Structure formats: structure tokens, C-alpha cells
Amino acid sequence: MIELILVIVILGILAAIAVPKFAATRTDAQISKGRSDISALRSAIVSERQSRLIKGDHDFINRLDNDVDANTEDVTIFDSNESLSATSPKLLMYGLKTKDAAGHWLKTDDNEYTYKFGSASVTFTYYPSDTTDDNDDFHPAGSFDCDHTDENCKKLTQ
């Protein structure tokens, strides 16, 4: 009987230690997924730009999706843009489905996308042309970036 109580106590202690570790691991996995998505997107933007330069087009693509409505779930983003025809190459071969949940992207405005991880979220903006924002921060054409003063942005980009 004492052995059974001892086993239950040990399992309780292990559970109290392990549960917070597993919760942190899930958020870390979502951050890693976000970093991977961001790297793939940035690489695809540059690759598409190089393809356009070879063809004599000096402009960056104008959007990262097929004019998807903001805050709409279960639609594909980052797969194409309105200037591409059905036979043209896509931005990402396999776009990402939107969802308003941790570990997922959601389009929140024209050329603005939010990535959620854990209880945090970070908004990224795509700049198809050179832009200076309201804070006098300069964003070069083709950049896909967030506010680097935000700690959550730093977790995804640094």
C-alpha cells in the first residue's frame, strides 16, 4: 500500500515538473515554424524578383496573395498574387491556410499578415515599393518585416 502511495506521489511530482516544460516546448515549436515560414517567404520574394529582372520587369510583386479578404479563415495565402497568370510560377508552391489560432497566419489587411504563437501575435507587412511609415522608418521595396522594437518580432526574426 505504501508503495502505491509513493508511486502516486512521484507521478504527481513528475507531472508538476513536466507540464510546464511541454507547454514551453509547444510555443518554441510554433516560433520555429514561424521562423521557417518567414525565411521561405522572404526567399520566395527575392526569387520572384530575380525572375522578373531577367524578364526586364524591375518591380517587386504587388501582393503576396490572390486578393484574399482580411480576417478570413481557411483560405490560402502566400501562394500567388494578382499580377500572376494561372500559368505563371507561384510565390510559394504550397501556400499556407489561414487560421486565427496559435501557429498559424491570418491576413489582417492589404499586405499585412499576423502570425500567432502561444498567446502572442506579430504583424508583418509586405512593402511592394520603397515606403516610409508614420514613425519615419524606411522599408525598402520587397521587404516583409515586422516592428523590431517588439520583443515577439525579435523572437521570429533574430
What are these regions (language model features)?
Residues 21-39, 52:
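Aliphatic-rich helix starts adjacent to a transmembrane/signal segment
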Residues 114-158:
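Short, surface-exposed interaction loops/tails
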Residues 45-89:
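Short, glycine/small-hydrophobic-rich surface segments
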Residues 1-27:
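N-terminal single-pass transmembrane signal-anchor helix
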Residues 107-114:
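Short, hydrophobic/aromatic-rich segments at coil-to-beta transitions
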Residues 77, 85-105:
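Long, low-complexity, serine/threonine/proline-rich intrinsically disordered regulatory regions
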